[in-house]
Amino acid sequence: PSTWQYCNNGPVLYGSLFQGEVYDALKDSEMEGWNTALYTPNESWKPAVEVALNGHISTSGNPNMPWVDDYSNYKLVGQFGQTVKAVNELTAISVEEVRPKVFVYDMGQNMVGVPQIQLSGMKPGTKICLRYAEVKYPDLPEYEGSIGMIMLENIRAAMAQDIYITRGGRETIHPRFTYHGYRFVEITGIDAPLATEAVKGIVLSSIHNFASSYETSNTLVNKLWKNITWSSSGNFLSIPTDCPQRNERLGWAGDISVFSRTATYLADVSQFLRRYVQSMRDVQRSDGRFPDIAPLGGGFGGLLWGSAGITVPWECYQQYGDKRLLNEHYDA
């Protein structure tokens, strides 16, 4: 519409699932209240321009999955399935200055989500860098020189880093356009450690509540149960992923093919899995084969991966007795 406007000078300078977020809080005042009816746009706002959809997309680039140039059959639909929301909150249990002005906070266990860090009295324009890791370098001879530092090798090409530029006064670091899988968060750019209670982790998931509980007299079995539910929560984030931390986080069909039955016992994931099965149909090959990865498409798995196009709808029906997914999916 001709009345639409846009602004490309807000505080979010960069946002990436793998690489993290860059946020300049010095720009907060310019955008304050922008999403309310009372907001009056300033000179930073420009008339929106309609741009033609040129070029093409590919469902995968694999054989039998041709380039897509015709978008006439594509349509917007309302979102369904469990949304991603905050389901838990952790507080750092310790902090260690592993190098001068390099502070590593321990959240107590691996988590999937974003930090929420309280600051006060910072000099305006201070650049604070946060990096995330699941483990630290252990005290072993081969890691001499790195002991105590966060280990990033298993994160691979993901930067897993957030940068926050302070405005001064009381403020909160709380990224919106990324997420991380981590236990340890390294903070640099501050002269002294923040109190552990100022460093929190907001746990995100598409599983809002678990429908099952399990407890025995064996503490190891109880811990295994907690590991299962915690890992399920961390890997059910919009899509069922293979991992929450490195430069992958993909909807590998083989993983959910073998786990879907367990998932249906743990929680009501009927709409979550319905959405995933639809994404499998969206990138289904012309010869009928389901992809190994959805919604991205492609992959290099075997029959087990594509079999999710059969096993997941069936497990949902077996658990929930709802035939709608079968009706939607049967022709595929």
Residue spans for each PLM region:
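A glycine-rich, coil/turn loop motif that links secondary-structure elements
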Residues: 245-250, 299-302
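Helix-terminus loop motifs that line ligand-binding clefts
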Residues: 140-154, 270-332
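C-terminal capping/lid segments that line or modulate ligand- or cofactor-binding pockets
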Residues: 21-24, 33, 247-248, 266, ...
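An alpha-helix initiation/capping motif
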Residues: 250-253, 331
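An alpha-helical repeat/solenoid feature that recognizes helix-turn-helix modules
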Residues: 252-258, 265, 302-306
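Generic, well-ordered alpha-helical scaffold segments in large soluble proteins
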Residues: 118-120, 188, 227, 231-235, ...
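Extracellular/oxidizing-compartment recognition motifs
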Residues: 1-245, 254-255, 271-274, 290-295, ...
